[in-house]
């Protein structure tokens, strides 16, 4: 039987009694954000709104974005990425499970030196895809042009964030490239790999 989102006790400052809030609301108060699904407009708007609100509330405390995502839509993902660069606090990115496609793009978009992968996490990069088979001829041409622009944008961001030459990133994105946490670190997508059973980083 589904139990829904777990609830945890939370005590507001100055109040004696605790109230029960869902676990994500409680974690948001600690500036911990979660992308645990495919990227779409709804989750993009939620994360953008949270980052902006938390930045207004306190622009000196870092934000932490935990990622376990198979990827998703390009434009909503770019909206999250741009917001991460725009808000004053540094945004740490943490890969747990899988960061694929747009998930890996957002992982790389964290503050450089503050991007982390758990030891058994997987990362995958590839070029943006499209639903060409649904388009008419004229739409196909326009969509192809737009897709090329998006691919160039994403490739340049990867090159900037990883320190790899543009041609290396371009070749890597020709196909699905899966990486372990240490391979993602060598590739420049993350800066640190968490060490098991300790609070330290490698």
From Swiss-Prot:
The gene coding this protein: clpP
One Pfam short name: CLP_protease
Protein function: Cleaves peptides in various proteins in a process that requires ATP hydrolysis. Has a chymotrypsin-like activity. Plays a major role in the degradation of misfolded proteins.
Protein name per Swiss-Prot or TrEMBL: ATP-dependent Clp protease proteolytic subunit
Localization: Plastid, Chloroplast stroma
Enzyme nomenclature, EC number: 3.4.21.92
Catalysed reactions, as listed in the record: Hydrolysis of proteins to small peptides in the presence of ATP and magnesium. alpha-casein is the usual test substrate. In the absence of ATP, only oligopeptides shorter than five residues are hydrolyzed (such as succinyl-Leu-Tyr-|-NHMec, and Leu-Tyr-Leu-|-Tyr-Trp, in which cleavage of the -Tyr-|-Leu- and -Tyr-|-Trp bonds also occurs)
Entries under InterPro entries matching the protein: ClpP (IPR001907), ClpP/crotonase-like_dom_sf (IPR029045), ClpP/TepA (IPR023562), ClpP_His_AS (IPR033135), ClpP_Ser_AS (IPR018215)
Active site: 101, 126
Keywords, sorted A to Z: Chloroplast, Hydrolase, Plastid, Protease, Serine protease
Record text on subunit structure and interactions: Component of the chloroplastic Clp protease core complex.
């Amino acid at each position: 039987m589904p139990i829904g989102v777990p609830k945890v006790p939370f005590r507001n400052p100055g109040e004696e009694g605790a109230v029960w809030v869902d676990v994500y609301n409680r974690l948001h108060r600690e500036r911990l954000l979660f992308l645990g699904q495919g990227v779409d407009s709804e989750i993009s708007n939620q994360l953008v709104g949270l980052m902006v609100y938390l930045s207004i509330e306190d622009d000196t405390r870092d934000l932490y974005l935990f990622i376990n995502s198979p990827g998703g839509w390009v434009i909503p993902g770019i909206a999250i990425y741009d917001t991460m660069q725009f808000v004053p606090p540094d945004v740490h990115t943490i890969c747990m499970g899988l960061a694929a496609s747009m998930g890996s793009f957002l992982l790389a978009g964290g503050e450089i030196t503050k991007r982390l992968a758990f030891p058994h996490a997987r990362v995958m990069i590839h070029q943006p895809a499209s639903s060409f088979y649904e388009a008419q001829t004229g739409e196909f041409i326009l969509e192809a042009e737009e897709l090329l622009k998006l691919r160039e944008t994403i490739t340049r961001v990867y090159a900037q964030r990883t320190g790899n030459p543009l041609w290396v990133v371009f070749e890597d994105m020709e196909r699905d490239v899966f990486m372990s946490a240490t391979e993602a670190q060598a590739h420049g997508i993350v800066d640190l790999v968490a060490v098991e059973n300790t609070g330290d980083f490698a």
